[in-house]
A protein has these predicted regions:
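Bacterial lipoprotein signal-peptidase II cleavage site
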Residues: 24-33
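Periplasmic-binding protein-like
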Residues: 143, 159, 223-228, 234-235, ...
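Conserved C-terminal helix/tail region of periplasmic/extracytoplasmic solute-binding proteins
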Residues: 341-379
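Extracytoplasmic ligand-binding site segments that recognize negatively charged/polar headgroups
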Residues: 62-76, 88-104, 108-249
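A ligand-binding cleft/hinge motif common to bilobed small-molecule-binding domains
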Residues: 119-123, 251-271
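N-terminal secretory signal peptides and thylakoid transit peptides that target proteins
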Residues: 1-16
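Mature extracytoplasmic/periplasmic domains
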Residues: 282-349
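Short beta-strand->loop
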Residues: 130-140, 152-154, 182, 265-266, ...
C-alpha cells in the first residue's frame, strides 16, 4: 500500500475544523450503513421518539472532543444534519477536559465528552462528574468491557498503542527499529524519542498504566525514569509524536498506531513506520459521556444514542480515524488490518486498576521525574 491515500481509498471528504468553540455546519456527509434498532421508531439511529422530541426542543448541544478534529467535526456536522440541533464543539485533550470539568464541579460549560482514552474518563467518573445513562444502543456493544460499570461512559472505538518511527532517519543514523518498550531505553536512542505529557494527554496515562501493568509499580516507574533520559519532548496531545514523525521533526514516537496510519494514508508521509511491541500491544478504549449537570440533558442523551450507531462511528475511517469499532453493526476499517493491526492481539489491560490508580500513578511518575521541565508541552 505504498502509494495508497485516503483520497483514493475513501474519496475526498471536506470538513472545516474550527478554532476554539465553533458551530458545526450542515453537511451531506455519507453516514454509512445503518441497522434499525427499534421498528417503532423512525429515528435514523434508533433513539426513542420522545427523546428525539425533547432534544429538539432543547435545540442545542455543546461538545468537548478529544479525538482528532476532522472526525470530531464530521460527527458534529452529521448530528446537526440529522436533528437540526445546533452543535458547538471544542477540541481539547482528555487531560484538559478532565481538569476543566473538575474545576466547574457539577456546572459544566459543555454537555458531552467525545473521544479520547477512558483512563481520564474513569478519573472523572470516580469524582462523580459524569452522568449515568443507559442508552438503547448500548445493546450493540460487542463486550461489556466497552462500557463503564457505573454506566456513565460508553466505548466507541479501540486503538492500539505502539511505536512509530521515521524509516528514513533511522536508516540514515544506521539504527535498528526498536521492537519493544525495553528497547526504547537504550542510550543509542537518546534525544530521538517523543512521547506525550502525562498531565495533559490520555495516551500518556495509557502509557503509564501499560508499563506498570507489564513490569509492576516500582519497576514501571523506574522504566519511565529511564525512558525519560531518551525523551526529547512530551507533546500536549497523544497524537503529537505521530505528526512530528510525519514532518521529520521526530525520529521515534510512542503513541496510537492509527495516528500513524493517518500520517501515511491521509498526509502521504511514507517515511512513517509502525511497530507493534513484541511483548504485546496495549490498547485504549475511546469513549463518550454526559457531564453531570449538563445544560441540555436530552440532547446529550440523544448524542450518546447517536455515538453508539453506525451513523456516527462509520464516519471515523472516512475522516482519517482508523481505530477499530466496538459496536456490532459498524463497518470495521479494513485499512487498519492491512497495516498489520489486530484488535484481538493485545495484552489483558486491567481497566479496574487503571480506574482506581491512574491519578496516583501520574503523581508518582512526575515526582520520580522531579516535576515537569520545558520538554513537557501544554500548548
Amino acid at each position: 500500500m505504498s502509494n495508497l491515500t485516503r483520497r483514493n481509498f475513501f474519496g475526498v471528504s471536506a470538513v472545516v475544523a474550527g478554532l476554539g468553540i465553533s458551530a458545526c455546519k450542515k453537511s451531506d456527509s455519507d453516514t454509512g450503513e445503518k441497522k434499525e434498532t427499534d421498528t417503532n421508531s423512525a429515528d435514523a439511529v434508533g433513539a426513542p421518539e420522545d427523546l428525539v422530541k425533547a432534544a429538539k426542543e432543547e435545540g442545542k448541544l455543546i461538545v468537548y472532543g478529544s479525538c482528532e478534529e476532522e472526525y470530531l467535526n464530521a460527527v458534529c456536522t452529521n448530528f446537526k444534519s440529522l436533528y437540526g440541533i445546533d452543535v458547538q464543539v471544542q477540541r481539547l485533550s482528555t487531560g484538559e477536559v478532565a481538569a476543566k470539568i473538575e474545576e466547574e464541579n457539577g456546572h459544566p460549560s459543555a454537555d458531552v465528552w467525545f473521544g479520547g482514552t477512558t483512563d481520564p474518563y474513569n478519573v472523572s467518573s470516580s469524582k462523580g462528574l459524569l452522568e449515568q445513562y443507559e442508552p438503547k444502543n448500548a445493546s450493540h456493544l460487542i463486550s461489556d468491557k466497552f462500557k463503564s460499570t457505573n454506566k456513565d461512559w460508553y466505548g466507541i472505538y479501540k486503538g492500539i498503542l505502539g511505536i512509530l518511527y521515521d524509516k528514513e532517519e533511522l536508516k540514515r543514523l544506521n539504527l535498528d527499529v526498536p521492537q519493544d518498550y525495553k528497547d526504547l531505553i537504550d542510550p543509542k536512542y537518546k534525544g530521538l524519542i517523543w512521547s506525550s505529557n502525562y498531565n495533559t494527554a490520555g495516551t500518556a496515562k495509557l502509557i503509564i498504566n501499560t508499563v506498570i501493568q507489564k513490569y509492576g509499580h516500582d519497576q514501571g516507574i523506574q522504566y519511565l525514569v529511564d525512558l525519560d533520559k531518551n525523551i526529547a519532548q512530551y507533546t500536549k496531545s497523544g497524537s503529537g509524536p505521530s505528526k512530528a514523525i510525519g514532518t521529520g521533526e521526530c525520529t521515534i514516537g510512542i503513541g496510537m498506531l492509527h495516528d500513524g496510519i493517518y500520517q501515511i494514508v491521509d498526509q502521504e508521509h511514507e517515511n512513517v513506520g509502525l511497530q507493534i511491541p513484541s511483548s504485546g500491544a496495549s490498547y485504549e478504549v475511546g469513549a463518550t459521556a454526559i457531564f453531570k449537570g449538563a445544560a441540555h440533558p436530552n440532547a446529550a442523551k440523544l448524542w450518546i444514542e447517536y455515538a453508539l450507531s453506525p451513523a456516527c462511528v462509520d464516519l471515523a475511517q472516512k475522516n482519517g480515524s482508523y481505530q477499530f469499532l466496538v459496536i456490532d453493526n459498524a463497518k470495521q476499517p479494513e485499512i487498519a488490518t492491512e497495516y498489520g493491526l489486530d484488535p484481538n492481539n493485545v495484552m489483558d489491560y486491567n481497566f479496574d486498576d487503571a480506574k482506581k490508580h491512574t491519578e496516583q500513578y501520574v503523581k508518582d511518575v512526575m515526582e520520580a521525574l522531579g516535576g515537569g521541565d520545558s520538554r513537557f508541552k501544554t500548548e
